[in-house]
Amino acid sequence: MGQFTVVSLGLLAVFLSLSGAKGDNCPANWISRNGVCNKLFPDRKTWLEAEMYCRALKPGCHLASLHRDSDSTVLAWYISDHFKGAGHVWIGLRDTNRKRTWKWSDRTSTNYFSWNQGEPNNVQDNENCVHLWAPSGYLKWNDEPCASLHPFICQYKL
């Protein structure tokens, strides 16, 4: 029995050291989800200013892209739990050609949407950027003019 415990502990130590070697840890104040690191910045910026800020942080960093319900849930929890009263929060989705063709700033596939009911509605033909809608608990999206000022979430792949 004692030898089994020693071998088990040895295998556990090897597993933990190898899993740490993958580099799946995000820097302090960033959260990890599905192979990416995210951080909310409370500074209020336009969509383009926020995207440029993210890009300046490190190569490959952009406004956050969401590709499944679990992505939305993790970010909604993070914002709600750590940034009370943040208001709407920019994500990396926008309609660059103003034809209701939504694309992520990191150029990943646009295969998932979580629009709030009645959205996107393109009020005054001027809503071409997307934020997480605060009244939905950050689970739903709304289109908004890109010049609006909001906090934002940056993201980069591990």
Swiss-Prot record:
Entry keywords, A to Z: Calcium, Disulfide bond, Hemagglutinin, Lectin, Metal-binding, Secreted, Signal, Toxin
Subcellular location field: Secreted
Motif Mannose-binding, chain ranges: 119-121
Keyword check for Lipoprotein: no
GO molecular function: carbohydrate binding; metal ion binding; toxin activity
Range of residues in the leader sequence: 1-23
Top-level taxon: Eukaryota
Pfam family, one: Lectin_C
Cellular component annotations (GO), alphabetically ordered: extracellular region
Main location: secreted
Key word Nuclease present: no
Tissue-specific expression: Expressed by the venom gland.
Gene3D superfamilies linked to this entry: Mannose-Binding Protein A, subunit A (3.10.100.10)
Family: Belongs to the true venom lectin family.
Entry protein name: C-type lectin lectoxin-Enh5
